[in-house]
């Protein structure tokens, strides 16, 4: 996705900020072999894993952690990589389709609660899809600590797979008889 995202960003006439997460530098994935002009569609999220019990909205390095947690928890969750995070390009069609199917949402991000993207996203989801939600929007986020002080504190501050697994267990309680 990175190649496609960067190529799409380079062709936009407006200013673009591409955020590269350091944890993704060592990750492996598929890349276009011969199509060096490959692009992902502007404003299009990617359903990484289909599911019917819960919609997991995430981005960057938390995508793989979310997939690991979903597998570990045994929840039939739909995991969506948002890809484009600006308000104008957010893929509300994909998000809405998934929410109408699952009736439950969890936002997974690495950042801390107060200053996070998920704060705005959660609020907007409740405004747009309130009638389709069977439980409150759940959020997994980092702890209230500055990740720039030391590597040890940084590792303690960021959200982990175990945090996602615990939140998935909470979500399962809201499924009713499932």
Regions found by a protein language model. Give the residues of each.
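Short, surface-exposed beta-edge/turn micro-motifs
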Residues: 14-15, 53
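Thiamine diphosphate
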Residues: 22-178
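Internal gly/pro-rich beta-alpha loop/helix module
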Residues: 1-14
């Amino acid at each position: 996705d990175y190649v496609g995202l960067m190529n799409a960003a380079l062709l936009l006439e407006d200013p673009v900020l591409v955020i590269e997460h350091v944890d993704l530098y060592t990750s492996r994935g598929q890349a276009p072999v011969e199509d060096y002009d490959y692009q992902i569609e502007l404003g299009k999220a990617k359903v990484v894993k289909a599911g019917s019990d819960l919609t997991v909205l995430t981005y960057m390095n938390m995508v793989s952690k979310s997939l690991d947690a979903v597998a570990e928890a045994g929840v039939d969750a739909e995991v969506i990589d948002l890809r484009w995070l600006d308000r104008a390009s957010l893929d509300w069609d994909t998000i809405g389709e998934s929410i109408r199917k699952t009736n439950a949402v969890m936002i997974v991000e690495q950042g801390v609660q107060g200053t996070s993207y998920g704060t705005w996203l959660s609020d907007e989801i409740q405004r747009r899809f309130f009638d389709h939600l069977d439980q409150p929007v759940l959020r997994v986020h980092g702890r209230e600590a500055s990740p720039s002080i030391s590597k040890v504190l940084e590792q303690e501050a960021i959200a982990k797979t175990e945090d996602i697994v615990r939140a998935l267990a909470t979500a399962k309680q809201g499924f009713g008889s499932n």
